[in-house]
């Protein structure tokens, strides 16, 4: 049964060409918002906390600080409203899910930049 679900996802779900990113990376997600008849593009820039799931049901969580309040947003990878994703900075973290990042403030909340080869 799982192979049938995977086959349908691979064949019929549209794949977007999105860059590869992982936990610790700082990315900007540009997505479309519909307000009545108008549509506008809004962006959300923050640190990737986690990537979860596989295939077409994959999601990722981004966290940013808005003043002194932390804001997290979960995006499905195949959300039709996503226009593009930019990687601003590659971060070097040891874990795939950096939930400990929620409790850090100030200079402790910095992520070391990864060395690109």
Curated annotation (Swiss-Prot):
Keywords: Ribonucleoprotein, Ribosomal protein. InterPro entries: Ribosomal_bL19, Ribosomal_bL19_sf, Translation_prot_SH3-like_sf. SUPFAM superfamilies: Translation proteins SH3-like domain. Transmembrane segments: none annotated. One of its GO terms (cellular component) is cytosolic large ribosomal subunit. Pfam families: Ribosomal_L19. One of its GO terms (molecular function) is structural constituent of ribosome. It comes from the Bacteria. GO terms for biological process: translation. Gene3D superfamilies: 2.30.30.790. PANTHER family: LARGE RIBOSOMAL SUBUNIT PROTEIN BL19M, RIBOSOMAL PROTEIN L19. This protein is located at the 30S-50S ribosomal subunit interface and may play a role in the structure and function of the aminoacyl-tRNA binding site. Belongs to the bacterial ribosomal protein bL19 family. HAMAP family: Ribosomal_bL19 (MF_00402). This is Large ribosomal subunit protein bL19. It comes from Christiangramia forsetii (strain DSM 17595 / CGMCC 1.15422 / KT0803) (Gramella forsetii). The gene is rplS.
């Amino acid at each position: 049964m799982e192979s049938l679900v995977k086959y349908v996802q691979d064949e019929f779900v549209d794949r977007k060409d999105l860059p590869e990113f992982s936990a610790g990376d700082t990315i900007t997600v540009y997505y479309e918002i519909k307000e009545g008849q108008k549509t506008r593009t809004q962006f959300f820039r923050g640190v990737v906390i986690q990537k979860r799931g596989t295939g077409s049901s994959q999601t990722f969580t981004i966290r940013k600080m808005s003043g002194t309040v932390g804001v997290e947003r979960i995006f499905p990878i195949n959300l039709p409203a996503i226009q593009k994703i930019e990687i601003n900075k590659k971060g070097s973290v040891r874990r795939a899910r950096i939930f400990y990042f929620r409790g850090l403030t100030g200079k402790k909340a910095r992520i070391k930049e990864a060395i690109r080869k």
